[in-house]
From Swiss-Prot:
It is an enzyme of class 2 (transferase). GO terms for biological process: nodulation; response to symbiont. Transmembrane segments: none annotated. Autophosphorylation stimulated by calcium. Occurs probably by an intermolecular mechanism. Residues 323-336 are annotated as: Calmodulin-binding. The modification Phosphothreonine is found at residue 265. The keyword Transport does not apply. Ca(2+) 1 binds at residues 407, 409, 411, 413, 418. GO terms for molecular function: ATP binding; calcium ion binding; calcium/calmodulin-dependent protein kinase activity; calmodulin binding; protein serine kinase activity. It comes from Lotus japonicus (Lotus corniculatus var. japonicus). It comes from the Eukaryota. ATP binds at residues 19-27, 44. Ca(2+) 2 binds at residues 443, 445, 447, 449, 454. This is Calcium and calcium/calmodulin-dependent serine/threonine-protein kinase.
Length: 518
C-alpha cells in the first residue's frame, strides 16, 4: 500500500454528510477521488483526547507494519477506546478480511487530532430497520440473520477477538439488495488476547451484556454468543428477554438467567428455536454453543425454521422496540461525549458576562443558515463572517478559541446547534421558560418536536457534575433516558418533554442546570 507523508485525508477523499456520531467518534460518508468508479466509503474519525507525543506531525500519513496503521506508541495510552479500536481493526485486517459478514477496512490516516478509519460503506440500513419494513417476516428470515451474524463471529473469534458490544445497531446491511450480506461492525469495545484496558468495560448496552460481564467475570467469545441469544429472542418476540422496573433488577435477572417463553406468541415459535435461545442464554458460558457450533444447528441452517408468516403482533412489537431502541441509542452515545460536558463553563470563561438576548440567538441561527455553505456546519472563516454580520466585534478576536472549543472532532467545522446551545446556556432562565429554551434550541426545523439526533444533542449538553455518581454502571444511561421516553414514535413533543421533567425533579435539575449560570 502506497505511503506519502504529505498525503492528507482530504487529498484522496471527498468528505460529505455525517452518517452517525458516537461519544468518542464521528462517521462521515466519503468518496475516493481517484479511480473511475468513485468508490463510496465510510470514514470513522476516532477523536484523540490527549496530546500527541512529539514527533507526530499534524496532518501527516503515518505508517505501520500492516496497511499503514499508526503504531501504538504514537497513540496516547490514556485514550483507551481509540487505542483499542486501532488494535482490533489491525487484527481484523491481518486475520479476518475480507469476510462477507465483517466490516472491511480500506485505509487509515492519522493526524495530530485523531485517527481516521476508511471503512466499507454499508448503505443497506440497520438490521431491525429492514425487518420491520418487510412485507413478510418468518422464522426463516430470523434464521438467515443469525446465520450471518454467527459466520462473522466465527471469523473474529478465530482471530481471538471478542466483540463485547454485539447489538442490532452494530449489524448493518451492505446495500439495499434483498440478498445483501449483513455486516458486523463497530469494534470499539472489542478485546483481543494481548490487550484489554479496564476502561473499555465501562461501556456497552446492558440489554445485551452477559452475566459474566456484569459479575466482573472473564469475558470470552461465549459472551458474544449470549448477546446473539438476546438478539434472537427479540427477533422472535419483538421484546427483550429481561424486562424489569429498574436497572438493578434487570442486572439481577441477567445474572440469574431469568427469562421465559410464557407470553402467548411464543406458542407459534418452533421448539427448536426456543431450545436454541435457551442454550445461548445459559448462565454458564462453557455450556453455550460456539459460533462454529451454531452454524451447524438445524434451525440456523433453516431446516427446522418455519416459513410461515409470524403473528402480526410480533412485527408490531418489533416496530415499537426498534423506534425506542434508536432514540435511546442516539442519546446514550452523545451523553458519553466527554469534552462537551464542560463546554458551558469554558464558553463562559471565554466570553465573560456577554449573554446573548433571545433575539440575538435567533439572529445567530439565521446568519448561520445564510452564510454556512455546509448546512449546519461552519468553518472558522464562516463563523467569523457570522459574528461580523451580527455586529459582534467584541467576540471576533475570540472566534478561533470558541471555534476550537466546539470543533468536536477536529475536522475544521463546528456544529451550529452546539454553538447555539452554548450561548443560550449563559442565560438565566427558570421554569417553563428554561424548558422551552432548551427544547427550542434543538427543534432546528421548527416542527414542534425533536428527533432522536436532537434529543441526543440536548442530553449531550449536561454538565459532568450534574450526572449521577453511578453513571458508569452498565445500563444507567438507559435508566435516565427511560424517564423521558414517553412513547415509541421516534420523536418527542414539548409536552412529552415537559411531562417527563414534572414527573422527576432530579431529571429537571440535571437538564436545567445547563441553562443556569455558574
Amino acid at each position: 500500500m502506497g505511503y506519502d507523508q504529505t498525503r492528507k485525508l482530504s487529498d484522496e477523499y471527498e468528505i460529505s454528510e455525517i452518517l452517525g456520531r458516537g461519544g468518542f467518534s464521528v462517521v462521515r460518508k466519503g468518496t475516493k477521488k481517484s479511480g473511475n468508479e468513485k468508490t463510496q466509503v465510510a470514514i470513522k474519525t476516532l477523536r484523540r483526547l490527549g496530546s500527541s507525543p512529539s514527533g507526530t506531525g499534524g496532518g501527516q500519513k503515518s505508517t505501520a507494519t500492516v496497511m499503514g496503521f499508526p503504531s501504538l506508541r504514537q497513540v496516547s495510552v490514556s485514550d483507551a477506546l481509540l487505542t483499542n479500536e486501532i488494535l482490533v481493526m489491525r487484527r481484523i485486517v491481518e486475520n479476518v478480511s475480507p469476510h462477507p459478514n465483517v466490516i472491511d477496512l480500506y485505509d487509515v490516516c492519522e493526524d495530530s487530532n485523531g485517527v481516521h478509519l476508511v471503512l466499507e460503506l454499508c448503505s443497506g440500513g440497520e438490521l431491525f430497520d429492514r425487518i420491520v419494513a418487510q412485507d413478510k417476516y418468518a422464522e426463516t428470515e430470523a434464521a438467515a440473520v443469525v446465520r450471518q451474524i454467527a459466520a462473522g463471529l466465527e471469523a473474529v473469534h478465530k482471530a481471538d477477538i471478542v466483540h463485547r458490544d454485539l447489538k442490532p445497531e452494530n449489524c448493518l446491511f451492505l446495500d439495499s439488495r434483498k440478498d445483501s450480506p449483513l455486516k458486523i461492525m463497530d469494534f470499539g469495545l472489542s478485546s483481543v488476547e494481548e490487550f484489554t484496558d479496564p476502561v473499555v468495560g465501562l461501556f456497552g448496552s446492558i440489554d445485551y451484556v452477559s452475566p459474566e460481564a456484569l459479575s466482573q467475570g472473564k469475558i470470552t467469545a461465549k459472551s458474544d454468543m449470549w448477546s446473539l441469544g438476546v438478539i434472537l429472542y427479540i427477533l422472535l418476540s419483538g421484546y427483550p428477554p429481561f424486562i424489569a422496573q429498574n436497572n438493578r433488577q434487570k442486572q439481577q435477572m441477567i445474572i440469574n438467567g431469568n427469562f421465559s417463553f410464557y407470553e402467548k406468541t411464543w406458542k407459534g415459535i418452533t421448539q427448536s428455536a426456543k431450545q436454541l435461545i435457551s442454550s445461548l442464554l445459559t448462565v454458564d458460558p462453557s455450556k453455550r454453543p460456539s459460533a462454529q457450533e451454531l452454524l451447524s444447528h438445524p434451525w440456523v441452517r433453516g431446516d427446522k425454521a418455519k416459513d410461515e408468516q409470524m403473528d402480526p403482533e410480533i412485527v408490531s412489537r418489533l416496530q415499537s422496540f426498534n423506534a425506542r431502541r434508536k432514540l435511546r441509542a442516539a442519546a446514550i452515545a452523545s451523553v458519553w461525549s466527554s469534552t462537551i460536558f464542560l463546554r458551558t463553563k469554558k464558553l463562559r470563561s471565554l466570553v465573560g458576562t456577554y449573554d446573548l438576548k433571545e433575539e440575538e440567538i435567533e439572529s445567530l441561527r439565521i446568519h448561520f443558515k445564510k452564510i454556512c455553505g455546509n448546512g449546519d456546519n461552519a468553518t472558522l472563516s464562516e463563523f467569523v463572517e457570522v459574528l461580523k454580520a451580527m455586529k459582534m466585534p467584541s467576540l471576533i478576536p475570540l472566534a478561533p478559541r470558541i471555534f476550537d472549543l466546539f470543533d468536536n472532532n477536529r475536522d475544521g467545522t463546528i456544529d451550529m446547534r452546539e454553538i447555539l446551545c452554548g450561548f443560550s446556556s449563559l442565560k438565566n432562565s427558570k421554569g417553563d421558560d428554561a424548558l422551552r429554551l432548551c427544547f427550542q434550541m434543538y427543534d432546528t426545523d421548527r416542527s414542534g418536536c425533536i428527533t432522536k439526533e436532537e434529543v441526543a444533542s440536548m442530553l449531550c449538553a449536561l454538565p459532568e457534575e450534574c450526572l449521577p455518581a453511578d453513571i458508569t454502571e452498565p445500563g444507567k444511561l438507559d435508566e435516565i433516558f427511560d424517564l423521558m421516553d414517553a412513547n415509541s414514535d421516534g420523536k418527542v413533543t414539548f409536552e412529552e418533554f415537559k411531562a417527563a421533567m414534572q414527573r422527576d425533579s432530579s431529571l429537571q435539575d440535571m437538564l436545567l442546570s445547563s441553562l443556569r449560570p455558574s
